[in-house]
Amino acid sequence: MSWLETYRGTVYRWEVDNVDHFTVAYYFARFEDATAAMLDALGLGREAFAAGRFSAVLDCRVRYLKELRVGDILHIRSGVTGADETGLLLGHEVYNSGDGVLCTTVEQRAVLMDAGSRTPLPLGGAERRAADARRVPWDGGRSSSTDHPEPADDRGFLDTARDTVKAWEVDTLGEAAPPAYIHRFSAANAHLLAGFGMTPAYMRERVRGFSTFEFRLRFPGALRAGDLVRVRSGLLHVGNSSMRILHRMANARTGEVVATLAQSGVHLDLAARRPAPLPDDLRERAKGMLVG
């Protein structure tokens, strides 16, 4: 049982969003650092890449427990929560280093891939033993508010984001890095909310915002520099203050779905930093947009 510190840093001014939270895309940049350090400790980082193999994260669950804001200092500790020949489960815990409070938990499913064919490879015995040496206790929350049946198609979904992958957004494998996906999903979320009246003007005037408390991110494919991107989004649930949203990102040239994000969040009172009931008129408009 051995946790490994995999990141230590701070939240910069340009990394906060319009509700004054550490922006989720920059969380994912930190998760990327933590994952790289953890895989390297297991011999599945550059050492594996030099041998024609690489590790890919296919599924990621994130729970946001406490806010991080500009100027906060943070660190991440990581470990293995499960391992077999099909791959690894990695767990990361994000702490506010100033007060020691656990802010975020992340669980990822990673698989070993052949760099040439991009097909899955089994984890060998030595690799599984290295993973077992890094096993940690984990209660990061496998039961999830984002674990719900998803619509089979996009009927009723809205077009919410469209652009092109830039060269500076790709990682060492030549694929779009996780923050590139999250930035687009964040833009898509803003367009979906505006569809029932939660526009930027509404949020400024009412001192309201949208705060995510849980993500489930999946990567069935990948994007590369120059690919055209399209995101379609659907509203799956509306409560008193809570909402559940599904985003699907596709390569606009081929139609291949490359990433999905199931997102749970709340209508937030920015002054009180607490969930606030949706106004009745917005809730009714939102209910008219429900899909699935």
Residue ranges of model-derived segments:
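Hot-dog-fold acyl-thioester-processing enzymes
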Residues: 1-59, 111-214, 269-292
